[in-house]
Amino acid sequence: MGFSSALQSRAAHEALIVRQDAELRLMETMKRSIQMKAKCDKEYAISLTAVAQQGLKIDRADEMQGSLISKSWRSYMDELDHQAKQFKFNAEQLEVVCDKLTHLSQDKRKARKAYQEEHAKIAARLNHLTDEVVRKKSEYQKHLEGYKALRTRFEENYIKAPSRSGRKLDDVRDKYQKACRKLHLTHNEYVLSITEAIEVEKDFRNVLLPGLLEHQQSVQESFILLWRNILQEAAQYGDLTADKYKEIQKRIDTVIGSINPTEEYGEFTEKYKTSPTTPLLFQFDETLIQDIPGKLQSSTLTVDNLTVDWLRNRLQELEGAVRDCQEKQMKMIEHVNGGSPVANGSIISNGSNTSNGIQSNKDSLCRQSKDLNALRCQEKQKQKLVDMIKCALNEVGCEELPSGCDDDLTLEQNFIENGYNNEQQRSNSTSSPGLGIMNELMRRGGVLTLLRGRGRHFKRKSTPQPATPMTRSRQGRFNKLQPRSQSLGSLSVIRDGNGPSPARYEPITNHRLRQAASVHYLGEEIATSSTNPPDLTRLRRTQCSMLCLGEDEEPVVLASPAPLTQLTAAVLTNTNNNHIYADLELDKKKDTSPSPECKGEQIQPKKEQIRIEINQTAPQNSIDAHLDRIDELNRVLDDRLKRTLQPSDDVNAIESAEENHIQTRKLAKDPDSQTKRSSSSSSECRSSKDTSHSKKRSLSFSQKSISNIFSNLKEFSKSPLVRMGKNHILNEEQDAKRTQPSQHHHSSGSDCPTNSSSSSSNNNNNNKNTSSNSNHSASQSTIITSTITTTITTTTTTTPSKENSRLKFKVPKIQKKSKAIRNTFRSKLLNFQLKRSKPCKQCTKRRRIHPSKSVFDFAKEFEVEQPAGSAADEQFCNCPPAGQKPVKPSVQISGHKDHPFESSSGELDENSDRDIDNDEEEEDSASDDVLSMKDHCYCVPSLAASISLSTNRPLYEEEWFHGVLPREEVVRLLNNDGDFLVRETIRNEESQIVLSVCWNGHKHFIVQTTGEGNFRFEGPPFASIQELIMHQYHSELPVTVKSGAILRRPVCRERWELSNDDVVLLERIGRGNFGDVYKAKLKSTKLDVAVKTCRMTLPDEQKRKFLQEGRILKQYDHPNIVKLIGICVQKQPIMIVMELVLGGSLLTYLRKNSNGLTTRQQMGMCRDAAAGMRYLESKNCIHRDLAARNCLVDLEHSVKISDFGMSREEEEYIVSDGMKQIPVKWTAPEALNFGKYTSLCDVWSYGILMWEIFSKGDTPYSGMTNSRARERIDTGYRMPTPKSTPEEMYRLMLQCWAADAESRPHFDEIYNVVDALILRLDNSH
């Protein structure tokens, strides 16, 4: 019987549903149980692996070499490890069984739901027809009653007046006919509904319901079959008696049974086999009794009155020991013949045939035999001694015992001889003179005791210990000496040349010697020949060397002190002190052979030497006393040296420059170079002079000189350097060409004679190392000069006709009146900004509006020469106003950066205020200022013409209108105060125009619309938004009083910002996360492109993420990266325009062409992807979504990386907004577990991409959910190799899937490997 015939009732149907629910619950219970068993098996496998690893940890395994036990144990542990791996494999298979059970449960739920729906459907059809029959029957009864009533009325009227025809009769007749017609129709419908119900009920009972039940029975039986197979797999993987376990156990039994006790030590014996030991020969030394008179004989006991008692006692002890040994032997023999079971070695079994630890009978017999032999040996040894003593005593017999002592004379003589020999031996032991003297000196203490601790006791307390000792013997000249930080204060050790005398201290009066001593170890010396005595003092490493000078050292002659300024320049710029020795050597040469002209001028300073006697023998009990005394001497000598130094030079003497040091050139040759040279000559002279003094004075004076120059610009402007004639402005092209040589000449040369003389002096007097130091000093001077000139607004200097070309210039003294100058400049600039938008009276054109950069700056930046009559210049007024005076050319001021900037020269002119007050047009023409602004895309001169009140273009064509640009992009574009742009936003499904300004932050102002349709902020309304923006821009009035934001610089659209009207959408070719993807065409170039659109309903956060892909792609250019053409943000919808790759998605391409792909093509795809990812890695870009679905293929099978929606331009990215929409099966474990993304995470994804390519589009981790795949990956599971995959490529996949991110290869290595494999494959074919 089946479901079709037995379960047609309603109760049976409900019971079938309940049974299916119970089966589903049972499946859930089974799944949980199998999961728990798999978990337990995994834990057991881990524990068993730990047991095997612990068993294999054998200390000194080489000592067990050749041991069968050790070999068997290792095999046993290896089999345990195999058993653990088998348990782990079975546990993993049980997890797969759980997955199958889960899928079966899901399919069963779907089948249950389908059965319920189908049963309800056919039952509802029958119920509907049943209800229809009932309804038709009630209608039939109703119409029948109406028919009967009207028929009665009609008959009554017709019978009463059959010949009359009237209106009333006609009405009755019509109603009667209608009732009759309704009755007949209802009758027919009722009959049809009954017939249909009969057929439906018959089919429901005989066909539909039995068929449904039969199908349900078939489905359930198929589920039961699958269920049984799943249970069989679970039982199979949980069977401990399986063949694999039996094989493991069999191998364990085999290796244990192979242990043969007789062969255990065979190899060990062969390895350490030696020949039998030779017997030791014990003989009496005859030399012991040669010099002893008496009766002592070798190997013979002496029996006399002195030893007889001891021999008898010894005999008794030995006889007792012999008896004890004999008794023990008797007892042992009795036990062997018949005793206790334990003694006999019988085995006590514990219910089995295996021993519980008691030795076998054979082992017991061996042990007893060994003990018996030992007792017999002891007995024999003691018996030998007994026989020897008895023999000696028997020889004496009953005779009188001989005397053991000689007469008194002999005894006394022996004592004397012994005493003499002992004394002689003692004298010989102390005959070594060197050792005795050293011991005596060490005992008494003194110089050697101090010398032993010289490295510790004779160091200055305030100086650190040297890290490594320096070699005292130096080869070559003094420039090979290395600087050290150890010093001995200001002392130098000298000796008197007349004869030996104690070492004395002398103050170092030479300044350079003092510097050398302060930075070198005292052990460094300069090697000199014996014929030429050294002129430099020898610097000792420790004071111990001072106390122990040799007797043959030459006297030391101190060099004469040199002026302080001759050495300081190099000292300030170099920590190496080789120049000190160089200067000393050169001074020595100068002193020894001076020129005739200089002999009369040279004044030899007096040498003042303080010679202080120091005892050569230090106190024996105090070394600190010596150190305290040395510190005291150092302090005295330091004070004396300070008093002997020359007074410092006057700092104020450098305040003014000499007349012949400052020269100006003619403007026709190089006005810019002349300007910079004249403006910086004073400070440059001071800097070069300043380097010739001490460091402290240098710093103080440089600060003072800078503050002098900063102090008063007003007095500075009154100098002759400013009051010069005016010339016309040279064209910008000539200024740009003269800028480069001017700057080069300014940085390389110098007009200061002091600096030149200093350089020549350094070149003549210093060695190679010192020359580099001098150059460094010169570079420092240049840096100081450039820093000073950067902060000063200088004026243009020309060669006047009424003044001489040689100027007398003096730096003004410190004053604080520069605020008025700044206020004057500010007022001029404000007037210029307010008046510059007025049209010219002659040509009706407007004056030039200066954006962030002038044409002069753009010409320099792009190295383009501006033609004389350019189109851009025709847009502005070039008419010279009447009575215009010559304008001073601008000054190039070198700043901290490489790019120069311009500054107006009219601010400091005496006549500039008067010119502005009298004539507005002259002010406009003379104030062609260029303001320093950001290098971003501010309005260029071509755009400046459009920023006017006469524009008729629509708003979306304005360069400063950015369309529906998100606020985050606005924040990125607006960087400086005054930057502004206009954009559109959608709020509450209503479009609004917003003005965004950077002013103490980023502020956004919604353009208000009046009732008349005009636009305004807080000021007057305007007819168009352009006019409103122009008014705010030219008037420089705040947008709102509260914000105070002023419009200064419009920010243009970037070059990749396209208009939506430039793109024509053709057909939809796909769908992305943010919207549809279309094939489109550009109107301008007729180029086919791909366009990604963003749905208008998405929030701003999603739109920002959508535009992020465009921002990343716009800066990349690589053949394996999809190229960005532009972004359309002028209006909705936002679009990203990219190149169209005709091959489409790589995943679709792999699945469609799975049969035609070759291994060479697949490896080429892998190489293309590696090349693109290598490029991204070099740009610090993390893709985060690398997969076959996000790669494109062109017609030449070349792969391009696409879909940068999740990309980040960082070396390391930490996810902070959750792990939603993360492709789990393509993501590295560290990113899933910790949210940490690096380029090595893309390497993991690249391995999955390779697997997709070689599997020809299969889904990774097929049959596993995301969570299940993640668990398997964490446990070490890796996907198997796809079919026909080269072994090297799969090995590369496994390297990309390394659990440790640092162990994965980088994309550069991956590309090289894949490229090498392709090359090898090509060569093989």
Curated annotation (Swiss-Prot):
Binding of ATP, residues: I1069, G1070, R1071, G1072, N1073, F1074, G1075, D1076, V1077, K1092
Pfam families registered for this protein in UniProt: FCH, PK_Tyr_Ser-Thr, SH2
Keyword Nucleotide-binding: yes
Chain ranges of the F-BAR domain: 1-264
Expression across tissues: Expressed in a subset of cells in the embryonic central nervous system (CNS). In the embryo, expressed in leading edge cells of the dorsal epidermis (at protein level). Expressed in many tissues during embryonic development, some expression is transient and absent from most of nervous system. In the embryo, strong expression in the leading edge cells from late stage 13 and throughout dorsal closure to the end of stage 15. In the embryonic CNS, expressed in the midline glia from stage 13, and by stage 16 expressed in a segmentally repeated subset of cells and in the dMP2 neurons.
Mutant phenotype after disruption: 53% of mutants die during embryogenesis with the remainder dying during larval and pupal development. In embryos the rate of dorsal closure is reduced and complete closure is delayed until after stage 16. During dorsal closure, filopodia are normal but the actomyosin cable is reduced and the leading edge cells have an irregular morphology. After dorsal closure, a very small percentage of embryos display a small anterior hole in their cuticle. Reduced phosphorylation of arm.
Residues bearing the modification Phosphotyrosine: Y1213
Subcellular location(s) per record: Membrane; Cell junction, Adherens junction
Region Disordered, annotated ranges: 453-506, 586-605, 659-700, 735-780, 875-928
Membrane topology: Peripheral membrane protein
The Protein kinase domain, residue ranges: 1063-1318
Protein task: Tyrosine-protein kinase which is required during embryogenesis for formation of the actin cable in leading edge cells of the dorsal epidermis and for the timely progression of dorsal closure. May play a role in regulation of adherens junctions and cell adhesion through phosphorylation of the beta-catenin arm.
Protein name (record): Tyrosine-protein kinase Fer
Species whose genome carries this gene: Drosophila melanogaster (Fruit fly)
